[in-house]
Amino acid sequence: MRGHLYVGVELYKNGFLDNAKMHMKHPKSELYADIIPTFKAKGSSGFSKELEELALAVEEEKDFNLISLKYKNLTDAITINESFINESSKSLNEKIVLVVSLLEIAAEEYAVGIVNKNVENKFEYQDALGFTVIAKDILTKSGTKNKEEEIKKNKTLVVLDSLFKLWPSLIPTGKVEGDSKIILNAIAEINSI
């Protein structure tokens, strides 16, 4: 979800309002309903209100300062809800499992977005970027318990950083020198660290 939101806000900030609107529809329509039972089970009210407020502000093409505030409110609400996860999910190894799962989604999205270096679906290309940015953000914010974990984290971050060349711009034009196999190879490399 954070991937869709990140890309939507970046597109909005850069003046691509129609593209931003598409990405703001995804989280509510595709993802939020699936996690409502988890919120109920954990005794959380979720973040539907904040998600709606951001989507509405984007739809109404409000000033970017307001969009930025609504985005911050939403990401803060998501962070609060993430605190309901159990302690074992906070370990570096579990964070890396999450990073790999986000990269797997990014690879799927990129494969739909870029086919034989041609832009087939710019929205999926953008989603793949969002998932990759969020994967890096999760790992960057992860703590480590010892030198070995610190080394593992840093090596994984180097692999993640190497992927950003796959997105030369937010709105792809012409040929894109990228392939989803690069993301899949990065996953294999991360798993071997």
Segments predicted by a language model, with ranges:
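Mature extracytoplasmic or organellar-lumen-exposed domains after removal of signal/transit peptides
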Residues: 1-193
